[in-house]
Design a protein with these regions (language model features):
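Soluble or luminal CAZymes and related metallo-dependent hydrolases
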Residues: 11, 238-242
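A short, well-structured juxtamembrane/interface segment
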Residues: 241-249
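Non-catalytic positions within long, well-ordered alpha-helices that form the structural scaffold/packing
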Residues: 251-254
Length: 285
């Protein structure tokens, strides 16, 4: 992870060095050499992804400086929302690293307290996925929609037994069910214990108003005020991510070009499923 960026970009190396000082460990070494068991811990992967995105953005603007003045809105999926706030000028890099590290620790702790999982249900609309969840949910357990990514791709989160029952229902109905390699049931009330810690961390984050608006995960609406972000971010970890609706919001605004900055191709893939004509360029490793 980040090998290409670190090899070619002095700016990227500088950001990773700064982040390592804040975190108290060599983040670049962890990204390059692992072990994956350490890198994949939510408490480590969240700052790693944030720093990677910031480094990719710096590298992107070095190559394409003209784009900086053309940006009309930003969005990011789950943790990516913090990278989007950084890109919009609402969150400094240093405070962003500390904030996502606190978020990662809080979510890791909440996930470790309960046996829970996430999974993707493929080829099914929202109403049918909700019906599967309602049928599979075990007494006293949580099972709910977590990420509404794009048509035919919805992630669910919940207690492990409810996930198991849902997998049987979905498979029996002839649809694809994919368990996700994540620490726990993100974007559900299982993460409720993490909210207080995140709110405390936000008090030190010194968010400011954004240069361009953010399309927020929780409501797919435009927001540009620091006071709004401080309320949206805690809600996000216990609420479904309305990603498809966020993409449609940007399309309805008349956005003519999308740029995906950072590792992975989530935007590229989900945008293609939402509107095949929408152009998207990806920049990362």
């Amino acid at each position: 992870m980040a090998a290409g960026l670190l090899a070619r970009s002095e700016s990227a190396r500088g950001l990773f060095a700064t982040a390592s000082e804040i975190l108290g460990f060599d983040l670049a070494a962890l990204c390059l050499n692992g072990p994956d068991t350490e890198l994949n811990l939510t408490s480590n992967s969240q700052p790693a992804l944030f720093v990677h995105s910031a480094a990719a953005l710096a590298d992107f603007y070095e190559q394409r400086p003209e784009v900086s003045d053309q940006v009309v809105a930003v969005a990011g999926l789950s943790l990516g929302e913090y990278s989007a706030l950084f890109a919009a000028g609402a969150l400094s890099f240093e405070r962003g690293v500390a904030l996502v590290a606190a978020r990662g620790r809080a979510m890791q702790s909440a996930a470790s307290a309960v046996s829970s999982q996430m999974a993707s249900v493929i080829g099914v609309d929202r109403e049918q996925v909700q019906s599967f969840c309602d049928q599979a949910r075990q007494p006293g357990e949580i099972l709910q929609l977590a990420n509404l990514l794009c048509p035919g791709n919805i992630a669910i989160s919940g207690h492990t037994e409810s996930i198991r029952v849902c997998e049987n229902l979905v498979s029996e109905a002839g649809y694809k069910f994919i368990r996700l390699a994540v620490a726990g049931a993100f974007h559900t009330d299982i993460m409720r214990p993490a909210v207080d810690e995140l709110q405390r961390a936000l008090e030190d984050a010194q968010l400011i108003d954004a240069r361009v608006p953010l399309v927020a995960n929780v409501d797919a609406q435009l927001h540009d005020r620091a006071s709004e972000f401080a309320g949206l971010l805690p809600r996000q970890i216990v609420s479904p991510v309305l990603w498809e609706a966020s993409l449609r919001k940007l399309l309805d605004m008349g956005v003519e070009q999308f740029y995906e900055i950072g590792t992975g191709r989530v935007l590229t893939g989900t945008l293609k499923r939402t509107d095949r004509k929408a152009p998207c360029e990806a920049f990362g490793d």
